[in-house]
From Swiss-Prot:
Belongs to the bacterial ribosomal protein bL9 family. GO terms for biological process: translation. Pfam families: Ribosomal_L9_C, Ribosomal_L9_N. InterPro entries: Ribosomal_bL9 (IPR000244), Ribosomal_bL9/RNase_H1_N (IPR009027), Ribosomal_bL9_bac/chp (IPR020594), Ribosomal_bL9_C (IPR020069), Ribosomal_bL9_C_sf (IPR036791), Ribosomal_bL9_N (IPR020070), Ribosomal_bL9_N_sf (IPR036935). This is Large ribosomal subunit protein bL9. Keywords: Ribonucleoprotein, Ribosomal protein, RNA-binding, rRNA-binding. It comes from Carboxydothermus hydrogenoformans (strain ATCC BAA-161 / DSM 6008 / Z-2901). Binds to the 23S rRNA.
Length: 151
């Protein structure tokens, strides 16, 4: 009998897979425990539509990420900090500061966890920060840190 798995089942498959199983195993275990449903024509059609919708959604997310990467490529974000001697900052610029400045200045909302800042910025200068927008899309954002009052 053919069943559609509703959750991952060890040694059988993952959610959404259509698998052939013994009649008793399918009815008495998989379907009874809610791990699968019988693969009727209607259920197979529904599964296909769900997969197509998921693919469209993933493609849309990828396109949006690529578009955002293009925008970020052309931005030089300027942040100001209180400077000390030798170009050092009092305090540091964090990924949270960068995310907030992007939203405030460019209306681009990015989760601070997507900013790949190896360590907080503690000196004046220009830095390149990687932004992980999507598993397949990474953008580079220029961040210039200048001393307050000097511009």
């Amino acid at each position: 009998m053919k069943v559609i798995l509703l959750t991952e089942v060890k040694k059988l498959g993952k959610k959404g897979d259509v698998v052939e199983v013994a009649e008793g195993y399918g009815r008495n275990y998989l379907i009874a425990k809610g791990l699968a449903v019988e693969a009727t024509e209607g259920k197979l059609k529904e599964l296909q539509q769900q997969k197509e919708a998921a693919n469209r959604r993933k493609e849309k997310e990828l396109q949006e990420a690529r578009s955002l990467a293009e925008k970020l490529k052309n931005i030089e974000l300027v942040l100001y900090g209180k400077g000390g001697e030798n170009g050092k900052l009092f305090g540091a610029i964090t990924s949270k500061d960068i995310a907030e400045a992007l939203e405030k200045n460019y209306q681009i909302k990015i989760d601070k966890r997507k900013l790949d800042l190896k360590e907080n910025i503690k000196a004046l200068g220009v830095y390149t920060v990687e932004v992980k927008l999507h598993p397949e899309v990474t953008a580079k954002l220029k961040v210039a840190v200048k001393e307050e009052g000097r511009g």
